[in-house]
């Protein structure tokens, strides 16, 4: 995908599918942008390969996206992207991943992950950082780091974005239009 997919704060709820490898987008090209999108209560299964919530390979930008639910696979799992050669900014994951070698945000990072947070069973946001940069972000454990901490950290990284995170009534971040933007 090489266009701009602006979810405009919308939610896709109950996405449930199984394929050899499973993700919403296969490849996000260097010119591609996916932003302001929430996937809620997904159930994804990669029957012979890997599974990721948003994209298999990111070469573009993923901004202000989130995934909740269960992601499992014959191979490895990730909440947002399997491999990152671009930018992932102010995203979060909360759910269940296959425990073996999983990254809540990304499995292999070769570029930039900024202010991304996660909850659920994953211990690491980035499973393997291969020359990339990880700036900010943490596991939300409810004691040291709470979801409000995540909201504040993500919004700091979203300067100029048309949506910001706010703490929803269910205790998890939700997207809200930034009234300061046109």
Label each PLM-derived region with a short phrase.
Residues 1-182:
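Predominantly extracellular beta-rich ligand-binding scaffolds that present long acidic/polar faces
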């Amino acid at each position: 995908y090489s266009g701009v997919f602006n979810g405009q704060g919308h939610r896709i709820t109950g996405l449930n599918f199984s394929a050899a490898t499973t993700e919403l987008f296969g490849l996000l090209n260097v010119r591609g942008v996916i932003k302001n999108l929430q996937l809620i209560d997904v159930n994804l299964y990669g029957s012979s390969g890997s599974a990721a919530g948003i994209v298999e390979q990111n070469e573009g930008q993923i901004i202000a996206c989130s995934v909740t639910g269960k992601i499992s696979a014959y191979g490895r799992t990730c909440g947002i992207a399997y491999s990152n050669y671009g930018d992932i900014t102010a995203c979060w994951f909360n759910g269940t991943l296959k425990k073996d070698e999983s990254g809540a945000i990304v499995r292999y990072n070769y570029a930039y992950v900024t202010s991304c947070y996660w909850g659920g069973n994953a211990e690491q946001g980035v499973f393997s950082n291969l020359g990339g940069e990880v700036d900010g972000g943490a596991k939300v454990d409810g004691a040291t780091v709470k979801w409000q901490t995540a909201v504040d950290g993500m919004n700091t990284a979203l300067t100029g974005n048309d949506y910001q995170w706010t703490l929803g009534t269910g205790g998890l971040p939700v997207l809200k239009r930034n009234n300061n933007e046109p």
